[in-house]
Amino acid sequence: KLVMEGISANSTAFLEETTPEEKPKAISAEQIEIKKDLLYDKYTLEDTYPYKDTTRSFQWDKIKERLALLENIQQTPSQWGILQNYKNRNGEAPLVRHYKRNAYKRIADTLGIERYQSVPLYLLTDTLVPERYGEDGSLVRFLADGENFVKVSPIYIGEEWYVPKRYVKVLPDTTHFIKTIMIDRRDQNIMTLEQTGEAQWTVRSMNPATTGRHRPPYAQETPLGIFVLQEKKTRMIFLKDGSTATGGFAPYASRFSDGGYIHGVPVNEPRKALIEYSPSLGTTPRSHMCVRNATSHSKFIFDWAPVNETIIFVLE
């Protein structure tokens, strides 16, 4: 085009030389190299392992896709943020344009994301009525600040949205994600990895886990998505279903979305002593939304994974 407009090829070369640095080349899933150097080595699963009359596995192709994504989104300097509305602490999200009542008799958007604990996402052309809900804990790229709204791009669902300021926690400029936890709903397993170089990742643990099950009105599935580790509790107290009475506690709990935690084997009242392992781990979904682990593995994650700097991928 420049040549056609009468600018010489030499001038173009000069222009090309002085333009800002070229965009870094995207890393493909095929380029990702994974080695194993376990920091936690109890109940370790093989890459493929027997389960009842079938086999289960760690889905390396999907894991590599997500690791490549995590590297690629960080190639250009970005301000990162987290969508936050745990227990509606930042205010109940307004009603979306089109909504329904789900199996739990709660309001949800047309994609099934519940209003409770979620964040309203507004189209860039309409800040009066939200279009859909964003899940608590979701990783977003922070694009622009405003008086009442900020512009963000959630990494999992994509596109650009306006969100009222109070629902977005902005992370420090220095934030860099090199630790990640992969939770597999299909095969009921969990893996921790950390980055050791460009396109190079090291597995730190690979273990059985149990995710949330769809069982209204109390138990629900662990949400799929890309989340940031938000907080930790040495003991997460839980209530008996449908009651305000304490049901017990889950040890070494690391929260990533809504009331979803990665935690150890639950301890029911009146017992107080920790339970290390349960034979149900790695079998079928059975928790309320949380990701249940051997208690020593949940403690490993609790100690190893920094808050606001660890990415949790929930995949299927």
Language-model-derived ranges and their functions:
Residues 14, 20-93, 131-166:
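SH3/SH3-like beta-barrel superfamily modules
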Residues 26-34, 38-40, 45-46, 51-53, ...:
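Exported/periplasmic cell-wall-interacting domains
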Residues 93-117, 268, 272-283:
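Short beta-strand/loop turn elements enriched in aromatics
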Residues 115-126, 288-295:
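Short, structured beta-strand/loop micro-motifs enriched in basic residues and often containing a Trp
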Residues 124-134, 202:
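SH3/SH3-like (including bacterial SH3b) beta-barrel domains
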Residues 135-138, 188, 296-303:
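Solvent-exposed, polar/charged alpha-helical surfaces in well-ordered, non-transmembrane soluble domains
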Residues 136, 223-224, 307-308:
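Short, flexible surface segments
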Residues 164-273:
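Gly/Pro-biased beta-strand-loop elements
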